[in-house]
Amino acid sequence: MNCRELPLTLWVLISVSTAESCTSRPHITVVEGEPFYLKHCSCSLAHEIETTTKSWYKSSGSQEHVELNPRSSSRIALHDCVLEFWPVELNDTGSYFFQMKNYTQKWKLNVIRRNKHSCFTERQVTSKIVEVKKFFQITCENSYYQTLVNSTSLYKNCKKLLLENNKNPTIKKNAEFEDQGYYSCVHFLHHNGKLFNITKTFNITIVEDRSNIVPVLLGPKLNHVAVELGKNVRLNCSALLNEEDVIYWMFGEENGSDPNIHEEKEMRIMTPEGKWHASKVLRIENIGESNLNVLYNCTVASTGGTDTKSFILVRKADMADIPGHVFTRGMIIAVLILVAVVCLVTVCVIYRVDLVLFYRHLTRRDETLTDGKTYDAFVSYLKECRPENGEEHTFAVEILPRVLEKHFGYKLCIFERDVVPGGAVVDEIHSLIEKSRRLIIVLSKSYMSNEVRYELESGLHEALVERKIKIILIEFTPVTDFTFLPQSLKLLKSHRVLKWKADKSLSYNSRFWKNLLYLMPAKTVKPGRDEPEVLPVLSES
């Protein structure tokens, strides 16, 4: 009978004890602030001879061995083969050596910081798994410090358990799911008039009875694996099963002696739920035609039955994969289309004015037929015709009408030409602005005079409040300081402004006139036949 089938498997004993007669582990981790000892193992097997020289050494990093003695630190005590710390601190981390005659034993000690917000330190917790309804026992004892221990307390999740025995508290019961948690044994002891404590913590996980698990293979029952001839493939079969269950591979007899098929060693680990996770890999090297379209079956077997999943190797071309040249060609086409779209968008942004004008010309769109207004634009400009303002005045009353009216077929409202003398000028201006689709403002250094102030205020009211008219700003001469303008016009100034450049704006096909037509209402253009294509030269001064 296998030892794991003995009834003793029904008993789970967790003995929280530090009763080892010597310290055999070469690497040790302890928590700061607790008593700790190192003991050489040979001393427990042989009678120590009084005359035998025993020495303890410490080495930290690149430092040489330093011999330890009671004068090294008040926290260190030497008792033949035992080195005691009262208590151990962070700076005690390092390598320790015990030397007796020609024999030397070495330990590597790592002292970690205590968790001040918990009754235990997570890095010093031992995990244990207990099956539900199995016998569960926790006994708190410490044989080395037993004579110094005053009392011992047992905590669950940092809450003290009220037990009868304060010297060696013990729990004995059948495990239930409610028993899961962190159990800490804390020993309180006195040494040289000081109080110390030693803590040992276990993380107890209660799981279902593992003997009742129904084994199951993970993943789909049928798997098609795309492979290339001459390559290698690994078929991984994983299952959740019981400890005594087995997992194995089966495939056709004709491949049974195939030297390119190998079963790797089974790997098993226990999950946090207490179940066994097994994995077994079938490795097929240098895949040939005989390995294709063959069933490779993975089976898990238990006393309650079996479960099987299958793998079939197929050629990659049979899986309708995209050929490499088709994929490359598709990627090139996709990149070219993306570049073309980016270029098209860039061209549209740069030449949007030309495109809009071309669209208007192509569709012969006219926005002025049904809006009930008389003029396409009211021109606001400086009325004082002084020598220094002569060219600005000429631009407003001669150049704009010549181009927009005679060449492009628009109808403008010019103050000097269209306002009837002797009438109520204020009312007349307000009426003309209401009848206009645009308000063209010719800006200059001397623009804000009393004569144009009302035109501006009325036009801004129509544009910003009633939204019945759109404003077009033309900067005839460079203006650096716009503090003379109303705040509302400054807001418009932050948007698009057309700048007149005499040397570059003379041609009707110049950027200035195209931008002005873009801002004007769409209208069927009827250019004059006798009009020259270039304006007379005007300076910018």
From Swiss-Prot:
Signal peptide interval: 1-18
On the Cytoplasmic side, which residues?
Answer: 351-541
Q: How is the protein disposed in the membrane?
A: Single-pass type I membrane protein
Query: Does the keyword section mention Heme?
Result: no
Q: Which residues form the Ig-like C2-type domain?
A: 33-121, 133-212, 220-312
Please list the residues annotated as glycosylated.
N91, N102, N150, N197, N203, N236, N255, N297
Report, as the record phrases it, the tissue specificity of this protein.
Highly expressed in leukocytes, spleen, lung. Also expressed, but at lower levels, in liver, small intestine, colon, prostate, thymus, placenta, and heart. Specifically coexpressed with IL18R1 in Th1 cells.
Q: Where in this chain does the record put each TIR domain?
A: 373-520
Query: A cellular component term (GO) from this record?
Result: plasma membrane
| InterPro entries linked to this entry | Ig-like_dom, Ig-like_dom_sf, Ig-like_fold, Ig_sub, IL-1_rcpt_fam, IL-1_rcpt_I/II-typ, TIR_dom, Toll_tir_struct_dom_sf
Query: What reaction does this catalyse?
Result: NAD(+) + H2O = ADP-D-ribose + nicotinamide + H(+)
One GO MF term attached to the UniProt entry: interleukin-1 receptor activity
Q: Which residues lie on this side of the membrane: Extracellular?
A: 22-329
- Supply the alphabetized keyword list: Disulfide bond, Glycoprotein, Hydrolase, Immunoglobulin domain, Inflammatory response, Membrane, NAD, Receptor, Repeat, Signal, Transmembrane, Transmembrane helix
Subcellular location as annotated: Membrane
Q: How is it modified after translation?
A: N-glycosylated. N-linked glycosyl chains contribute to ligand recognition and intra-receptor interactions required for formation of an active ternary receptor complex.
**EC nos:** 3.2.2.6
Look at the named UniProt entry and state the broad enzyme category this protein falls under.
hydrolase
**Which residues are listed as membrane-spanning?**
330-350
**Quick one: a GO biological-process term for this protein?**
interleukin-18-mediated signaling pathway
Q: What is known of its domains?
A: The TIR domain mediates NAD(+) hydrolase (NADase) activity. Self-association of TIR domains is required for NADase activity.
Q: Which family does it belong to?
A: Belongs to the interleukin-1 receptor family.
Q: What does this protein do?
A: Within the IL18 receptor complex, responsible for the binding of the pro-inflammatory cytokine IL18, but not IL1A nor IL1B. Involved in IL18-mediated IFNG synthesis from T-helper 1 (Th1) cells. Contributes to IL18-induced cytokine production, either independently of SLC12A3, or as a complex with SLC12A3.
Q: What is this protein called?
A: Interleukin-18 receptor 1
